[in-house]
A protein has these predicted regions:
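Electropositive, gly/pro-rich neighborhoods at or near active sites that engage anionic ligands
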Residues: 1-145
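A short, acidic, amphipathic alpha-helical segment used as a generic capping/interface helix at domain edges
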Residues: 10-12, 60-62, 163-173, 188
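Residue-level detector of flexible, active-site-proximal loop/helix-junction positions
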Residues: 83, 157, 212
């Protein structure tokens, strides 16, 4: 699998081309929230699901393991070092402290900000349809074949339920072939997608995060408003 090249917009077009060419791969996007978990903070997310991570939990260790993954077919999106929204050390810390492989690198915002409209356009017009692992229950006009629901407070109880929930997700995808499987399951996505790829590499696994939230949850992110600066931003690594 070749490395992605160029800015965020160019990366997205390369991802879409790979999907249309029936290539199998995965994308995970550890960003600000995952960074706080890795840095061992206790905090409550302000994302609409409002889960709480407690320091010294197992999720921190599972994330560390996941983002060091050297599977050449797994792209790992991290915050860029040019937009200035994230702490200035985050880009370097992901690469050096947490050992994200640079050959696998893409942008944490690859499906968001100025790429959101293009991502929505692609998902809505994807004729084969896709599976969605999510907490969102609202009906919407997307070709979703089926939803696999998770508890929106799963982070809170991860220490107790991670084995059974991970097994449930793996059982859900194990027999699927040549499918697009989208994950909107917060930090757990970063743990699950590498495991799914190992068990069953014959699919595309995308960490779409909050991309469909305004449709499946009724919650609005700033980048979905064309009048915000977020909706116009296109990241590039320097």
């Amino acid at each position: 699998m070749t490395s992605l090249v160029g800015n965020m917009r160019e990366h997205l077009e390369q991802i879409i081309e790979k999907i249309n060419n029936n290539e199998y791969f995965g994308v995970i996007r550890p960003s600000d929230g995952e960074f706080l978990i890795l840095e061992n903070h206790t905090f409550t997310a302000q994302t609409g699901d409002d889960w709480t991570n407690k320091s010294d939990g197992l999720l921190r260790e599972h994330l560390k393991e996941a983002i060091k993954n050297i599977n050449p077919k797994l792209y790992i999106g991290i915050p860029c070092n040019t937009c200035g929204h994230s702490p200035s050390n985050m880009y370097d810390d992901y690469l050096i402290k947490y050992q994200v492989p640079k050959t696998n690198l893409t942008y944490a915002n690859i499906f968001c900000n100025s790429n959101w409209s293009r991502t929505i356009e692609f998902l809505k017009s994807y004729e084969k349809g896709f599976f969605l692992i999510t907490t969102g229950t609202l009906e919407c006009d997307f070709p979703i074949k089926e939803r696999c629901y998770i508890d929106k407070f799963l982070v809170n109880n991860w220490n107790e339920v991670w084995e059974t929930e991970t097994e449930r997700i793996l059982n859900y995808i194990k027999d699927k072939q040549n499918e697009l499987i989208c994950f909107a399951s917060g930090p757990m996505t970063k743990v699950w997608i590498p495991k799914c790829m190992e068990l069953n590499p014959n699919n595309v696994y995308l960490d779409i995060g909050s991309v469909l939230d305004c449709y499946t949850k009724g919650t609005i992110r700033p980048y979905t408003d064309p009048n915000t600066t977020y909706s116009k931003e296109c990241c590039i690594f320097l």
